[in-house]
Amino acid sequence: MALRYKCPNQVAIPAFVYACEENISRRSPRECIIIGSSPVTTMFAAPVHRRGFATSCRALAGLTGPVESRAVVFAEHGDPTKVLKAHRYRLDKLDKGQVRLRFELGAINPADINVIQGVYPSKPQVREDIGPEPLSIMGNEGVATIEGFEEDGQVEHRFKVGDRVVMGAPQLGTWQSHANLPHSSLIPLPSDAHLHLRQAATLAINPPTAWRMLSDFVPLNPEDPNSVSKGKKKQWVIQNGANSAVGQAVIQLAREWGVGTINLVRSRPSIDELKSHLQSLGADHVLTYDEFLSRENNTRTKIKEWIGRDGEMRLALNCVGGKETAEMAKLLSMDGKLVTYGGMAKTALALPPSLFIFRKLTSVGFWLSNWVQTHPEERQTMMRSLAELTAQGKLKEPETEVVELAGSDEEVAEKMSGVMKRIEEGRGKKILLHWKDE
């Protein structure tokens, strides 16, 4: 593999990289030898171990030239089963400070459906440089491998060829095969965590959302100096949408932190199987919405008995809305927090004024995208902790299915339409997209 440096005198100078790990030798990128009257810079390195450095020259490493990328895109908002299509476009050579990515898996989340419909506040960039009409490349979460990068002589970054990364900024387009992105928009995965691809692809959005909601409103993380988990009373959390990816992460983190959980789910033919699955993750109690609202079952009394006099429940997590959420709020102790991070029922949330007046209830919203903009360093620490828990088997990823994308653009568009129909009907596992090599 041949690389090229572009030095200040604008002379293109070849550098050769030998990738044999048994015979790696390196020389400083500023080391020169003279052949005739021309300076020649040489460096020997293995791309899989190539690290960034600061130099007065621009340096390329790995794969940096133009390639063809394939992507799932839309030209206008609308029905996800109808507006998505596949698109091929030329990905130009890297610019200064950019990183070349090969996406391994791109995750589909409920918010992505809202993005396609045009009802989500965070939107992908409208690209006018990749086709005859403006297009938006879909995908907010996924895992990618670094195939190359260009150093600009000013920035020293922390990546090397072969590193796996997740997205550190929203709507970067993870449903494509390749991308050139700024290194500042990426988060490296710790190599010593040994995560497999499915774990890595589902790590950047849902587990952090669960972590923050369990930490920021009622401090339940025992590592927090202000954690109420260290007090005399056992802490409890109640949540709806407990079978969602966020809900499952909440269950597992709460179990790890010694916090009890009461989990509400929609009734279905396989409800016993679902309850068993959530309990295997650490759920203390699982109820359907019908069971929760039933007066015949005297559920409120049962929940109070579960919590007991030695416990308290100050946190409720809501991603649904509707009547069930109001009933959840009524069960909270004094100074309770109702945190809303979704509204799948698409109905208004009505809460009795008495909860605010006499019980000092606080109702707030949470969106991870807002939090990450102001907590970059804390996010890095959190991601490492989540990666470690995942590697230790203490935080399991949701059940996933990999959908292979290949063939003509028409074939890919048809497959994506089928995937969106399945998601719309609530069938199947969490979908991960993978572009097959051609």
Language-model segments: residues:
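N-terminal mitochondrial targeting presequence
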Residues: 1-68
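Glycine-rich beta-strand-centered segment in the early N-terminal region that forms part
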Residues: 90-107, 120-173
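NAD(P)H dinucleotide-binding glycine-rich loop of Rossmann-like/cofactor-binding domains
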Residues: 128-143, 155, 164-241
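Glycine-rich NAD(P) Rossmann-fold beta1-alpha1 loop
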Residues: 207, 241-248, 322
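Adenosine-nucleotide cofactor-binding segment
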Residues: 255-324
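Helix-to-beta-strand junctions that scaffold the AdoMet/dcAdoMet cofactor pocket
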Residues: 332-333
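Rossmann-fold dehydrogenase core element
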Residues: 336-339, 351-396
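C-terminal hydrophobic helical "lid"/dimerization subdomain
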Residues: 374-438
